[in-house]
Amino acid sequence: MNAKRKRTKKRGNPLGVIVGVVLVVALVLVVGEIALRMFLGKEISDGFREAEQSRGAVVSEDVQTSFGSNPVLLALLTSELGGMNLRTPSTLQITDPRAENGAPQIIGSPAADVTLTDVDISNTSDPVASRVEVVAELPSDLMIADANISVSDATGGSGNIFEDLVSSAVRLTALTPHPDRGVLTAEFSGGLATADLRPVVRDGGIAVEVEGGSVLGVQADGLISRFADAAVTGPAQQIGHGFTVAGVEVTDGGMAITLDGRDIALSSVSAIEYR
């Protein structure tokens, strides 16, 4: 009887062995999935950091990367991910946006939420997506600085002597967002003039409608329009190269634009080139 018991113990439980093997394999797959997600996230973050630093920007935060429920391990065989979501941090450094002591300086990129669909990860540091949606956040100071730089560079070319004289002295000093009205109230030279700027999507791009505006009591539609175009469409055009503008809205911090692109490399999303 004892011998029979011993033989039973030696035989063990085949089902238990199978379950154990399955659990080990599942654990290995889970660990591998986590490790691969971390690796890809680091590659993308490092690529973003290198691109920004090469232009002199300071990167204090990593890119936040999410792959959702898409199995990343499968991408090792197919070199393609179903989708990816990124949150790129702002690296903007804006010096003297109101041009009080000379020309403003702009370095870096604004923050953005990026959604990539059907991503080719053959090059892990610079994936290419068949479709990309970018929601970029443009702070008021960025638009103010860009307007003052652009109008200063163009001074003297309007063909209107009065406008050229005024534009050489006038600076955009404030942009106050009014999300409820969908406008940005522009203030020039500390209150010398004001005008409401309404950003709109037009023909796949961004345009601005100017509502009111005078300088020293004299209508100066051309001057106001030059500042408005530079403030609203300038930064958006630089971000949106290769994209179609799908939406624009005034936010508490300035303006947000939604861009849509096809067959876009991640490196083309991460940065704005400035002077």
Feature names for model-found ranges:
Residues 57-144, 148-170, 182:
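N-terminal beta-strand/beta-hairpin edge segment
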Residues 169-219:
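Short helix-loop boundary/capping segments
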Residues 201-275:
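Extracytoplasmic/luminal low-complexity segments enriched in Pro/Gly and acidic/polar residues
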